[in-house]
Structure formats: C-alpha cells, structure tokens
Amino acid sequence: LLSRFSNYEPKLLSKEDPFQRIALLSGPEPQRSLLEEKILRHFDGLPGKSLIVRGVAGDDVSVDKNTTILNGIDDLTLSKALSRNPIVYCRSGYSTLMDLLHLQHTRAVLIPTPGQTEQVYLGARFARMFGFTCIGQHMSLPVENEILDAQYPKLNGGNLLEESVDQLLSASSSKAI
C-alpha cells in the first residue's frame, strides 16, 4: 500500500496513547469548518479523550480537558495515535484510506467531502469491503457503541507494491532461459 506510514510498523508504535477517538479534518472551506463544528458538537460530553487535527495553519488550541485540538501533526505522532485503534472520523480521500489500511485500522467513520464524487465512491466501497461506516456530511454521526460493538474484518494491508514486484520478478525469472 502507498502510505505515508510505510516506514512504521502497525500496532507496535504506542502503548500510551489516550485517545478514544480522533478526527482528521481536511477539505475545502467552508466544508472543512462545517465538519469541524459538527465533530466538536458530537465529541462534547463523550467519555474519554478526543483528538481533533484541524489541518490548518496557526496555533494549536485545546477546548477542554477531554478534547485536544491540533492544527497539524507530524506523521510519527499521528501513526502512534492511530495505532491504538481509536474511532477515526475522517474524509474518504484516497491517501487517508491507504493510511488507515496500512495501520490495519478497523474503526472509521468516513465522511466524504460534499461534491467530491471520488470520495463518495471510495467511502461506499471501503464501507462494503472493510466494514467502515460511511455517512454524508449532512447526516448524524453514529453512536460510538455501535461502532465499538461491530465485528470488523481483519485488515491485511501488507505491502502490495512490494508483493507485486516480487511476483513479477519471480514470474519473469522462471521464463528466462
């Protein structure tokens, strides 16, 4: 899989990360801000710790003792947070989906950016293939117990590029004289 986390081993990065849910916000304005407001309302009052990565420039802020808001985050820190398998709320863009698969992440609420037909398609496809939840931005966010109680298929992200190259080399060497 092509992922910014390809150099990190999934599930072995962190035993200390406290977040039960992480929102990764992205997309054009005003859609990004509308999703942020919806996520903030949803996270308010939920038990446990939440992390919101806003994907904008500026100083980091924190809403309260249970919600940390960062404008940006480095790859290693994010991969550590995601490796603990919190519920992830994110857009269904290709790069984000590849990151989730690489880390063998099993609990995600995919929210395609309105008007982005590729994200709508990918969100629906990944919901069918991997058991993720996919909703429109205008819809209510799901009850977390439903996500936590669901039985998700085991993801086998692997390194598809490396495996494909190995198969190609193996096939071509067996045909060589």
Regions found by a protein language model. Give the residues of each.
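Short acidic-hydrophobic, aromatic-tinged amphipathic segments that line or gate anion-handling sites
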Residues: 2, 68-73, 131-140
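Donor-nucleotide binding loops and adjacent catalytic segments primarily
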Residues: 5-87
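Short amphipathic alpha-helical segments
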Residues: 35-37, 63-65, 100-103, 121-123
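Short secondary-structure boundary/capping elements
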Residues: 73, 91-92, 160
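Short acidic active-site motifs
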Residues: 76-78, 96, 142, 164
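A donor-sugar binding/catalytic signature common to diverse glycosyltransferases
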Residues: 78-121
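Nucleotide-sugar donor-binding patch of glycosyltransferase catalytic domains
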Residues: 104-150
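C-terminal amphipathic helix plus adjacent low-complexity
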Residues: 144-177
